Regions:
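Donor/substrate-binding cores of folate-linked one-carbon enzymes
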Residues: 22, 32, 81-200, 205-207
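Short active-site oxyanion
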Residues: 1-4, 79-82, 209
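Internal alpha/beta domain cores that form substrate/cofactor-binding pockets in large enzymes
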Residues: 2-4, 27-28, 58-77, 90-108
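Amphipathic, non-transmembrane alpha-helical secondary structure
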Residues: 13, 17-21, 72-75, 93, ...
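N-terminal glycine-/serine-/threonine-rich beta1-alpha1-beta2 phosphate-ribose binding loop
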Residues: 36-80
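An anion-binding loop in the catalytic cleft
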Residues: 213-310
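N-terminal Rossmann-like dinucleotide-binding module
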Residues: 1-40
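Residue-level detector of anion-binding/catalytic polar loops
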Residues: 25, 58, 130, 241
Length: 310
């Protein structure tokens, strides 16, 4: 099939590479404009653009995809279907109607659950045991189109946003390459989403990362994993921000106030939660590098009874 591919971050690269490998003709890649990075302000290609350039595919980077000029540019690229994966701009109905098969979106959740911008983080934070990707026929709403195809995956107890993202990136490529032949053969049956079963995965913010030790150890562990590597979970220790990169929820019984350091071991320390405790394994004190708790404890004399969060 002739395809115009729309996407921007790493998540979309898996699908683009899979479509190229399957032999589809990618007539153009549409992605966000290059962004300045670091103190130098040097412009950096979006990951999808890097992939397109590597394969010699034309790249179109409109600041606003809805303008008449952008739409006229899109019309220059022949396409049976537009494939969209984390593009970052909302498409107008005029664009949705351009290709023969419309626009298909690769969404990183099992719709109708977790519509919105942050489904991967949210499924971990909420304690889901299963997620996946949905191939959806796009309409003018936000992730509200008819579902065409789904692939599921289990969420491991140690999965972080980073590891689950990478699994779903691969799964998205598998799903779209399995769905397209069925679409062309007329074997996909659109299924309307049940709005009663939906929930919205709102944008993740840095403020969400502050650990509230009045929650259970299991809840805190899920928050840490869901926000690793960005924006990261954190607390305060001796007046400085302390990022917690890895911890293990423990069923430790105690009577201490939430946030109290219960025990200090050679390679970890335990912090009281409302139920159970967090065994901190990897962390980063403000102004320092990320390190194991073992290395941290070699330089900092952490004492039982101290309180995190102050």
């Amino acid at each position: 099939m002739q395809i115009v591919f729309m996407g921007t971050p790493d998540f979309a690269v898996g699908a683009l590479e899979a479509l190229i490998a399957q032999g589809h003709e990618i007539t153009a890649v549409v992605t966000q404009p290059d962004k300045a990075k670091g103190r130098s302000g040097q412009l950096q290609f979006p990951p999808v653009k890097e992939c397109a350039v590597k394969h010699g595919i034309p790249v179109f980077q409109p600041r606003r995809i809805k303008t008449p000029e952008a739409i006229e540019e899109l019309k220059k690229y022949p396409a049976d279907v537009y494939i969209v994966a984390a593009f970052g701009q909302i498409l107008s109905q005029e664009i949705l109607d351009l290709p023969k098969y419309g626009c298909l979106n690769i969404h990183a959740s099992l719709l109708p659950k977790y519509r919105g911008a942050s489904p991967i983080q949210r499924v971990i934070i909420d304690g889901e045991t299963q997620t996946g990707v949905t191939i959806m026929q796009m309409n003018a709403g936000l992730d509200t189109g008819d579902m065409l195809y789904q692939k599921k995956i289990s969420i491991a107890s140690e999965d972080t946003f980073e590891t689950l993202h990478d699994k779903l990136m691969v799964l998205g490529g598998e799903a779209i390459t399995e769905a397209l032949p069925l679409l062309e053969a007329g074997k996909l049956t659109p299924e309307k989403q049940d709005d009663a079963k939906t929930c919205y995965a709102a944008l993740i913010t840095k403020e969400m990362g502050r650990l509230d030790f009045t929650k259970t150890a299991a809840e805190l562990d899920r928050l840490i994993r869901g926000l690793t590597p960005w924006p990261s979970a954190y607390t305060f220790y001796r007046g400085k921000q302390l990022k917690i990169w890895k911890a293990i929820p423990m069923a430790t019984a105690h009577r201490e106030a939430p946030g109290t350091i219960l025990a200090v071991n050679k390679d970890s320390f335990e912090v009281a939660a409302s139920e159970g405790a967090l065994k901190v394994m990897e962390l980063q004190l403000e102004g320092k590098k990320r390190m194991t708790a073992h290395d941290f404890l070699l330089g900092v004399k952490v004492q039982p009874g101290e309180i995190l969060g102050e």
